[in-house]
């Protein structure tokens, strides 16, 4: 693929839906919020390359360490490897697809998903609160890639810390983006400096993120866009190589 003529999109889930950093041929990057992943795709050309920080391709059974991609990339990240969490089985992801109206219902659904996850994993493993929090977004992309196989050649899973590592000559970031749930300014500055070395203007990165997205969501989407460019140019690498496939034929790999 040739990135010179491709629209490149980097996406990450956020409170308002999805944050996307995009760049067309010869244009500066822009940032926008979309309420759904379908809306994001509808706003991009059919030949755009999209890299997204979200698991794609679900296992029927989960082994120790999660899917193959997670097990492969963790050792590269050193102290940052905790940012890569294991994905449970497809059955656990779809154990409860309700729209939760109370916190009690949310926790009850988490318990149900954990029960299914333990029954479909070896050793038995429940679902972390962090993983459960993005289940609905994983299902969004999963449903689209099942219904539209054409998307499988232009929507790619990536991971911010793996992407930063690849851009940093395969050296993991030294500082965390967050400490105890709060943004770590030093870690953010480290990543902004790396993004600037790869073509971003600091004024773009220093702007407040759109309403409904956090500052770290913005940087994650920004590095995803660079990964989309690497995929388009053929310089990105999938983990594993070649990618696996899930029960629906959806490719399973983290690209960076």
Predicted regions and their residues:
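RNase H-like (RuvC/DEDD) metal-dependent nuclease/polynucleotide-processing core
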Residues: 2-8, 13-256
